[in-house]
């Protein structure tokens, strides 16, 4: 990868993780809407937002080319399921006072990226990366052994998003086109659920206040902008390098949870956080050292 691509990837990754970091504040505004309904709005409005964006950017030629490769279309169905599950779990966690555990999941994610990069992409571990991964595993095991609890939400978010990044990396599809196909795969299920199954005080848009409807429509923008930045970054950076930026989002989530939303980490969570933070510190220092050494 050339220097220009790397610089673009860095900027895109920074933008993606910053927006993701403050995204919980948006979902807190619509906390009274069921998580499954918010998910359907994310899918539906993301699809239409992508159609408009593709038209403005005149990128329909990419879609025509992609349609000629059915294998990639099928793999985008797999990535759609992964990201859809990740979205649902994240929304539920934020609006059910588990923002801290959600942030833990995204702290763990960079280390999962390293493991997947080694297993599926042939990326080699350095010794310090091994140490970081082992410390992260120890943090989860200590919580399980000492406190008898397992950070299910955190692990679910970490692994679903890591596998999503891996699949998108392997497919190597242009970011906007891939996002359009993913939401197109999810659209029928989302539409059927919202208009035929969902039955709550907020499921009928014709009866909702305009302010709520605008917030629900905004789910498309909140969803697609950072995800487009992420998928574009994933095609320009090594998966392990992409993991370097992941700490930005969960740090912002952690600060939001503790400072603005009154969540207090218990002893079990703090033990795991401590291990993960030390692991990430080692990972970051190793990445900086390696980058400086190779640039000489």
Curated annotation (Swiss-Prot):
Q: Kindly name one Pfam family recorded for this protein.
A: EamA
For this UniProt record, the keywords arranged alphabetically read as follows: Cell inner membrane, Cell membrane, Membrane, Transmembrane, Transmembrane helix, Transport
Instruction: List where this protein forms a coiled coil.
Output: none
Which parts of the chain span the membrane according to its record? Answer: 12-34, 38-60, 73-95, 100-122, 129-146, 150-167, 180-197, 212-234, 239-261, 271-290
Q: How does it sit in the membrane?
A: Multi-pass membrane protein
Periplasmic side, ranges: 35-37, 96-99, 147-149, 198-211, 262-270
Specify the protein name: Protein RarD
Where it mainly occurs, coarsely classed, is membrane
Q: Where in the cell is it found?
A: Cell inner membrane
Tell me which family the UniProt entry assigns to this protein: Belongs to the EamA transporter family.
Instruction: List the ranges whose topology is Cytoplasmic.
Output: 1-11, 61-72, 123-128, 168-179, 235-238, 291-296
* Lineage, highest ranks first: Bacteria, Pseudomonadati, Pseudomonadota, Gammaproteobacteria, Enterobacterales
Transmembrane helix found in the keyword field: yes
| PANTHER family referenced in this protein's UniProt entry, alphabetically | ACYL-MALONYL CONDENSING ENZYME-RELATED, SOLUTE CARRIER FAMILY 35 MEMBER G2-RELATED
All copies of the EamA domain together span 18-145
Presence of the UniProt keyword Protein transport in the record: no
InterPro entries for this protein:
EamA_dom, RarD
User: One Gene Ontology cellular component annotation?
Assistant: plasma membrane
């Amino acid at each position: 990868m050339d220097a220009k691509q790397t610089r673009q990837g860095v900027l895109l990754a920074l933008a993606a993780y910053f927006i993701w970091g403050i995204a919980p504040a948006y979902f807190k505004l619509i906390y009274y809407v069921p998580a499954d309904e918010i998910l359907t709005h994310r899918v539906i409005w993301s699809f239409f937002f992508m159609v408009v964006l593709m038209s403005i950017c005149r990128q329909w030629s990419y879609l025509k080319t992609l349609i000629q490769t059915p294998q990639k279309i099928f793999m985008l169905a797999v990535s759609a399921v992964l990201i859809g599950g990740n979205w649902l779990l994240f929304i539920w966690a934020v609006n059910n006072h588990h923002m801290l555990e959600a942030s833990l999941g995204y702290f763990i994610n960079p280390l999962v990226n390293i493991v997947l990069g080694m297993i599926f992409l042939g990326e080699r571990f350095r010794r310090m990366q091994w140490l970081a991964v082992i410390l992260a595993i120890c943090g989860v095991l200590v919580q399980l052994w000492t406190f008898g609890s397992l950070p299910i939400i955190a692990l679910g978010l970490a692994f679903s998003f890591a596998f999503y990044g891996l699949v998108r990396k392997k497919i190597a599809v242009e970011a906007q086109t891939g996002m359009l196909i993913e939401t197109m795969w999810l659209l029928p299920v989302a539409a059927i659920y919202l208009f035929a199954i969902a039955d709550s005080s907020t499921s009928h848009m014709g009866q909702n206040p305009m302010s709520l409807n605008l917030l629900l429509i905004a789910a498309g923008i909140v969803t697609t902008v950072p995800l487009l930045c992420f998928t574009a970054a994933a095609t320009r950076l090594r998966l392990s390098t992409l993991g370097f930026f992941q700490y930005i989002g969960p740090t912002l989530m952690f600060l939001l949870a503790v400072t603005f939303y009154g969540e207090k980490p218990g002893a079990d969570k703090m033990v795991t956080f401590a291990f993960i933070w030390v692991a990430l510190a080692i990972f970051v220092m190793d990445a900086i050292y390696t980058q400086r050494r190779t640039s000489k």
